[in-house]
Amino acid sequence: MFASPIARLVQQLGKLPGIGEKTAARLAFHILRASPEDAAALAAAIAEVKQKIRFCSVCCDLTESDPCAICRDARRDPGVVCVVAQPQDVVAIERTGGYRGRYHVLHGVLSPLDGIGPDDLRVTELVARCAGGPAAADGSGGDQSIREAILATSPSVEGEATAVYLAKLLRPLGVRATRIATGVPIGGELEYADQVTLARAIDGRREM
């Protein structure tokens, strides 16, 4: 049996995705072996991110300032929005250096088996953005409405179902719904695709 403080640390680390009890125990003992300064820095970083990071009121990405830097950037095309499942996907696409539109982060995909429906995602906010409102909350980028939504959810069963659902919602709003090309492996996660493959997938997007 672990001492109570260690057991509590293992329990909390075990709540992280992909972390089982054995891995949580290894992480806990790594922290115990770390210097007091490193352990304190880890705790401070966790506290800081919970205190300072929020959702962008425009695109729902994670940000320290609101609206986020991408939504405030007047050099980006406010009429094209790339719809992704997770904040990590924004980072992956930005690494390609070829996309100059804006984003909308759903924070998940439709998964009926897991009890995740449209109300659990940032779908309402996307529809509101595509209904003809300004491109950014602070007015940056002018008042051009969204004309194209690039549906860039991963090509898994859930990702495809989410893209089809969103396309049906957006078409009546006069928004062109396109889907990234299948350069990304079927069943793969967007954040793990290499930069060239991801750039070609966006360039080769197709109508939904």
Which role does the model predict for each range below?
Residues A24, R72-T153:
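Extended interfacial segments that mediate partner engagement and assembly in macromolecular machines
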Residues V49-K52, E64:
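Short metal-coordination and nucleic-acid-contact micro-motifs, chiefly zinc-binding Cys/His arrays
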Residues M1-P17:
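Extended, structured, electrostatic nucleic-acid-contact surfaces
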Residues C56-C59, C68-C71:
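Short cysteine-rich clusters marking metal-coordination/redox-active sites
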